[in-house]
UniProtKB/Swiss-Prot annotation:
Source taxon at top rank: Bacteria
Chain's gene name: prfC
Role, per record: Increases the formation of ribosomal termination complexes and stimulates activities of RF-1 and RF-2. It binds guanine nucleotides and has strong preference for UGA stop codons. It may interact directly with the ribosome. The stimulation of RF-1 and RF-2 is significantly reduced by GTP and GDP, but not by GMP.
UniProt protein name: Peptide chain release factor 3
Annotated InterPro entries: EF-G-like_DII (IPR053905), EFG_III/V (IPR035647), G_TR_CS (IPR031157), P-loop_NTPase (IPR027417), PrfC (IPR004548), RF3_C (IPR032090), RF3_dom_3_sf (IPR038467), RF3_GTP-bd (IPR041732)
GO biological process, any: regulation of translational termination
Amino acid sequence: MSPMSLQDQVATRRTFAIISHPDAGKTTITEKLLLYGNLIQSAGTVKGKKSGKHATSDWMEMEKERGISVTTSVMQFPYKGATVNLLDTPGHADFSEDTYRTLTAVDSALMVIDAAKGVEQRTVKLMEVCRLRDTPILTFINKLDRDVRDGIDVLDEIEDVLNIECAPITWPIGMGKSFKGVYNLLTDTTVLYKTGQGHTVQDVREVKGLNNPELDEAVGTDYAEELRDTLELVQGASHEFDLERFLAGKLTPVFFGTALGNFGVDHMLDGLVQWAPPPQPRDATARTVEADEPKMTGFVFKIQANMDPRHRDRIAFMRICSGTYRKGIKLKQVRTGKDVRIADALTFLAGERDNVEEAFSGDIIGLHNHGTIQIGDTFTEGEELAFTGIPHFAPELFQRVVLNDPLKSKQLHKGLTQLAEEGATQVFFPLRNNDVILGAVGSLQFDVVAARLKGEYGVDCRYEPVSVATARWVEADSDKELAAFERKAHDNLSRDGAGHLTYLAPTRVNLQLAQERHPDIRFRETREI
């Protein structure tokens, strides 16, 4: 068999992320996808919070304790001729920045909705992010094996709240204890549900034709009649699937099922492989980069410290945007201008790492990082270009970090700077004193940092309140203007972990006054990396 060309490799890639509100069942779906990709033999490993078994994709100590996905992990698996790259995103509300950046590295997204709760606040936020790039969205309405809301209601809510058209591909028959299966509107086939099959891929029974007497026999006449009546309503009130509108991010195909009961996930996966786009062109400073160009380019969207407690290492996650990675390739790190030879890139199955011989556009690889790689770094085979649109946000909460052992100050600085590189928190060093201030988007991040400083760096610390209301990165057209501002506003200025000058405002009013007094200084809420 001749090896596949780059064009063929790119055409088979599907790189997507899962977005959902916490507890909508995202981790369970991740497990089931791996089951269909033959990566795990039994998908009984996510019972999250109560049972002792832990989800395959939630591998950091703290996640194991809390049952939330705090870090984005990457999993690659084969399915029906495609190579699927799944990026798992943190489901907890505090981790929006990490999730935001992950969504810059995918070509499509799967939205998971709890059928009992409908559209929840976190999903709304994530959809706004997908909107910015018109990311195509598939929808899985989960937990049909529980008592849930009416399907038409849930679709109406998705259309109203998320402002996207819904095209149901499958439709549920019954729910809760009397959930019977789903009817596929495109193939005119009913797929029947049997309980207690959550751990393995089972053969399912299918009935062809909506008016087939076998259907009445299989689900009962009442349910069959109700399905026929409901479908008339559904087809009258909803949109038909339209590939162009889906690819433009305007319409979402909707699948119903139960991830825990291992039912319906494969229907969604079939849709993903059939309709979701392969790797797309990417905007860079100099030009747009096509996915099937022969030379390799890529950008780092995430850095994860200590993925392997045995190795005390940091891994930079890189999305390949064009070309082929081959072991030993020489790449230019555009920000520093340095050439690096990469012989030990990794691929992932949630904590299981393997050295990769080659990888293609659309794939995610891990680079060993000894402090030289930053989020947003572009790597090329020599060309001067940088991929755009990977943001840092100004934090909203601040605490002063106080060491319980003053002799550990060096380890504290190192630990905080490394953890800040991951992008979930930011560290600030005020110019006027030796304080260390930690900034975050949500309060859980402070707990995460304290736990990781202790567990991974041997640093015991506590937090104290600090009078900082908000932070802004400051820029000016000339170094002279910036230096003058630095003298005048010295008491409010700090450097962040990457050395950028930052204004820490004690109040919103103070920030407003500073902006009025210094019109030649730009106060930025986000910093493009």
